[in-house]
Amino acid sequence: MAAPVQTIDVLLAEHADLERALADPELHSRPDEARKAGRRFARLAPIVATYRKLVAAREDLETAHELAATDESFAAEAAELEARVAELDSQLTDMLAPRDPHDADDIVLEVKSGEGGEESALFAADLARMYIRYAERHGWTVTVLGETTSDLGGYKDATLAIASKGDTADGVWSRMKFEGGVHRVQRVPVTESQGRVHTSAAGVLVYPEPEEVGEVQIDESDLRIDVYRSSGKGGQGVNTTDSAVRITHLPTGIVVTCQNERSQLQNKIRAMQVLGARLQAIAEEQAMADASADRASQIRTVDRSERIRTYNFPENRITDHRIGYKSHNLDQVLDGDLDALFDALAAADKQARLQQP
């Protein structure tokens, strides 16, 4: 299938304009605009590079056909170039297909304990560590915005902000957007004295954090703002003063906490950013609800019947129930080795999108 030339021309022109703009020192005096331009440039760069490779391969193929007409020894080269052109054309067509507009965004991820009491809180902490280790493998930064710990050091709830360090079309959201849902664990709890396997659950909510959250209007009268002492595990990165901030959005009941910034004002600003991202995500979900039932996969309650994945410790097995994915490397997955699973989820999502009318 030939690539849409008109679309390519538009993108090539935009890429050239951005390249000129980014070379202008004046743009970099406005950091927010420069970062936005840099991100867009990074998204276009692989498309432009693939297009240029395709153009070069087509020119080589045309030359090979001309030479093969008089010298059969060039026939094999022409066949290889035909395959190369087809491959690049397919890649470009895929790149030009509609994408999730948030794929380049960073994320905020919440982990909440559910059924299972203390064991559920310990499992929630395992999930948080799993995501932190995955982020570390990719060179991303993780900030713990808030946490409430259990008696045994688990998480009743924890909120993480995960950000990529560079400008890329495939950001944190593109990899981790499928994690929202109920995660079930089957194992012998540390509180179990008779060695019996128990089942408990923890919930994950993940939403994109766009660079600009300007579409959501937040009325100050809809907010209840509380200041409290940090309840985290301590350490240099956690405040021990009364600077932690909890913001409750009364119309929706959404609660956002932030405790790891250096001052109460900074914690409030960060919490407002997270609240804005959550409200924008909810607004987008509602807008898309009539068009697609896909978005219903995000959890609102922590109920084992809504599980998306099971972590079976006795069998070292992980099962993602949405796509039938199974692997017996649970120990590696909990250490952040999630790429194979995320690749499978992305492939299944892409296939589902292609089948939609």
Curated annotation (Swiss-Prot):
The modification N5-methylglutamine is found at Q236. Keywords: Cytoplasm, Methylation, Protein biosynthesis. Disulfide bonds: none annotated. It is found in: Cytoplasm. InterPro entries: PCRF (IPR005139), Pep_chain_release_fac_I (IPR000352), Pep_chain_release_fac_I_sf (IPR045853), Prokaryotic/Mito_RF (IPR050057), RF-1 (IPR004373). One of its GO terms (cellular component) is cytoplasm. Methylated by PrmC. Methylation increases the termination efficiency of RF1. The keyword Protein biosynthesis applies. SUPFAM superfamilies: Release factor. GO terms for molecular function: translation release factor activity, codon specific. NCBIfam families: prfA (TIGR00019), PRK00591.1 (NF001859). HAMAP family: Rel_fac_1 (MF_00093). Belongs to the prokaryotic/mitochondrial release factor family. Peptide chain release factor 1 directs the termination of translation in response to the peptide chain termination codons UAG and UAA. This is Peptide chain release factor 1. It comes from Mycobacterium marinum (strain ATCC BAA-535 / M). The gene is prfA.
